[in-house]
UniProtKB/Swiss-Prot annotation, chain A:
Subcellular location: Cytoplasm
Record-listed GTP binding positions: 48-55
Comp. bias regions, Gly residues: 9-22
Function summary: Facilitates the functional incorporation of the urease nickel metallocenter. This process requires GTP hydrolysis, probably effectuated by UreG.
Organism (species): Parafrankia sp. (strain EAN1pec)
Cellular component GO terms held in the UniProt record: cytoplasm
Region (Disordered): 1-43
Protein name as catalogued: Urease accessory protein UreG
Gene designation per UniProt: ureG
Length: 245, 231
């Protein structure tokens, strides 16, 4: 089913400019995320630049959630089925619950401009496995502008990491500014790369309009293999009957 | 006050490379041909596209036109006659010996039907017909003629693969557009021949252009270790 959400990323409105540092893509004021669906699985997109830890985060979420809710995963690799293979070999989820979509060198196209193959994949998961509570749709590694269409997902998580430098949140863009949850990953590397987490937190909050419904979480999957804060956020997005007690 | 205006804008919409119909993830054999070294540049690509157009392009265009004609003749049915469509499906199957190509065709038929249902009065079934069959159904629903369906199919048979070559080889996209313009007259000719065939022949006697090299490329692609395109 095509979601037909009429919800622009970041809640609508034009990109705003911040003073002094030149134009930035900031979060405009807008509407909160729509209600969670009750007739099918909640679909949560996981996007972000290459190497920021999307697949590792999805594996962590599988580890944390697979025993508690009915879960499926769709991967969108840049090429072949590398990410799906990684998830299968990590043993965090039954391989039958993982589907791979090939994206023809354009991962952002498959999650934003032409979502049809991904819609086929998420629908096939539920028609093959029966009703699910949650489907994670992992994008292929792309760049700061690659975000999901809300015709495909109900919520989206954007994953960046500290190793890319603490300037990344300040650069803004639709993923940093408008995603429902921003995850700053690999915080254990911060001292090694000279990244100031306080600066990242401040810039991210500013880019996201300081909105309480658009949180930022800092993670280190090395010390928290189940990404517990992110898992809690995901569970809170489920409609209440589907939430484990 | 206004007379009959022929549907043209709908054809442009249907043939637009940006139509979200799943085509962007399919290279039509180009990726496998790049990997085996048979496409290395513009000239190779032009020859590949000409061959594709004359074989699988003609086949797709003929069936798109024939299905469009059949649906239009049957009237504005919301549910298409399943037995009629099954004949077309079986004939396309018989002309597509590669299982990988059959799967790619049905995957693209499914994604095209999905976007078309959001745009025109297209029935829910068939859910995943061959791409050329879907094109015929959708063209009819969009108020287009059989020759339009043929033209859209012939165009798609070269346009998508050309785009894939740009992404895979880093070819100059302007130069590739020049190649597509060079063969545009052939696209028109193939579409006209397909339209004529669809008017005169029964489904089992429609063109059966065959390209064993495309079949082999499709099969090799499905087992390739590294793959960017679905087909």
């Amino acid at each position: 089913m095509h979601l037909e959400h009429d919800r622009p990323l970041g809640g609508g409105g034009a990109p705003a400019a911040s003073g002094g540092a030149g134009p930035r893509w900031q979060s405009p004021p807008g509407t909160p995320a729509g209600p969670a669906p009750t007739d099918r699985a909640l679909r949560v997109g996981v996007g972000g630049p290459v190497g920021s830890g999307k697949t590792a985060l999805v594996a962590a979420l599988c580890r944390a959630l697979a025993g508690r809710i009915r879960l499926g995963v769709v991967t969108n690799d840049i090429y072949t089925t590398e990410d799906a293979d990684f998830l299968r070999s990590a043993g965090v989820l039954d391989p039958g619950r993982i589907r791979a979509v090939e994206t023809g060198c354009c991962p952002h196209t498959a999650i934003r401009d032409d979502i049809t193959a991904n819609l086929d994949a998420v629908e096939d998961l539920e028609s093959d496995l029966g009703r699910l509570d949650l489907i994670l749709v992992e994008s292929g590694g792309d760049n700061l502008t690659a975000t999901f269409s809300y015709g495909l997902v109900d919520r989206q998580i954007f994953v960046i990491d500290v190793a890319g430098g603490d300037k990344v949140p300040r650069k803004g863009g639709p993923g940093v500014a408008g995603s429902d949850l921003l995850v700053v990953n690999k915080t254990d590397l911060a001292p090694l790369v000279g990244a100031d987490l306080a600066v990242m937190a401040r810039d991210a909050a500013a880019m996201r309009g300081g909105r309480a419904d658009r949180p930022v979480l800092f993670t280190s999957l090395r010390s928290d293999a189940g990404a517990s804060d992110v898992a809690d956020w995901v569970l809170a997005q489920l409609p209440s009957p589907a939430r484990p007690q | 006050m206004t007379g009959h205006v022929e549907a043209r804008a709908a054809l442009l919409l249907l043939a637009d490379g940006r139509l979200p119909a799943g085509g962007h993830a399919h290279s039509g054999g180009v990726e496998a041909a790049v990997l085996d070294g048979s496409i290395t540049g513009l000239r190779d690509l032009a020859e590949f596209l000409r061959g594709r157009l004359a074989t699988s392009g003609l086949l797709a265009a003929s069936f798109a036109a024939a299905v469009c004609r059949s649906v239009r003749t049957a009237g504005p049915a919301t549910e298409l006659a399943a037995d009629v469509l099954a004949v077309f499906e079986a004939e396309v199957d018989a002309r597509t010996p590669s299982p990988a190509q059959r799967a790619a065709s049905r995957a693209q038929g499914r994604t095209l039907m999905r976007v078309a249902r959001a745009a025109w009065a297209v029935p829910a079934h068939p859910a995943a017909p061959h791409h050329c069959v879907a094109l015929g159904i959708v063209a009819a629903a969009a108020g287009l003629e059989p020759r339009d369906a043929a033209l859209a199919a012939a165009h798609a048979s070269v346009n998508g693969p050309a785009t894939a070559a740009v992404r895979l080889l880093g070819l100059d996209p302007l130069a590739v557009t020049g190649v597509l313009a060079e063969i545009a007259a052939e696209v028109d000719r193939i579409a006209a021949a397909a339209d004529t065939a669809s008017a005169l022949r029964a489904p089992e006697r429609l063109p059966a252009g065959s390209a064993p090299q495309l079949d082999l490329l499709a099969e090799r692609h499905r087992t390739a270790e590294v793959r960017m395109f679905t087909s």
